[in-house]
């Protein structure tokens, strides 16, 4: 029996980018089922860093696409973020320093996806441009596999970064070693030891620190990392420059649906 393979996309107010992400997946030969976890809602960002208070309207993902299932969380049907934060105020801490990854919504969404997709999944964000088939990441010996973004625009730390680029979670392997949730608050970077013959990875990076410290079977060869830029930073956020958004759209223009146009015949000789 073939192993179940699922692509999970976390969607937030950017339907045109989610569509482009799905089309880029299909473009590179992946016919795996796609699950879109729709967190779209109206949100007001407070003033700060030289920007006024601003409100982003809700833009849920409504497009019908073959092989795509949408999990509607626009009204908190799956995860009621406000209620969860009230119950666990110290567990979920916002991390909006780098493109919003690590926010409470992302953290709780990934935890929910672990419940909904118990056989493992590849997690991508809506503003990712796939340039090759990600099937190489789907390997049962890995507990975690990821592509790394190297000094891409939007990464103010100037270091390689995994999430939320493109990563594979082997949920059964995680669970076998007592890992039942993913916490970006303690799982930010993964640095491979260049001179270490044991293929060692920096703690305090990918996976939980205590997993790396106390679950040695999840370390080393059971983690795979492949350097590759698969993300054009900044394009998915309404508060970034129009130039950045235009660059993203230009890079993805062949993936967007275009309205049918009536061809006109020019009677003049060419």
Model-assigned labels for residue ranges:
Residues 44-117:
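Active-site-proximal specificity loops/subdomain of glycosyltransferases
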Residues 163-179:
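Conserved nucleotide-sugar donor-binding
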Residues 38-40:
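Acidic ATP/Mg2+-coordinating residue in the GHKL
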Residues 175-248:
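Catalytic core and acceptor-binding pocket of nucleotide-sugar-dependent glycosyltransferases
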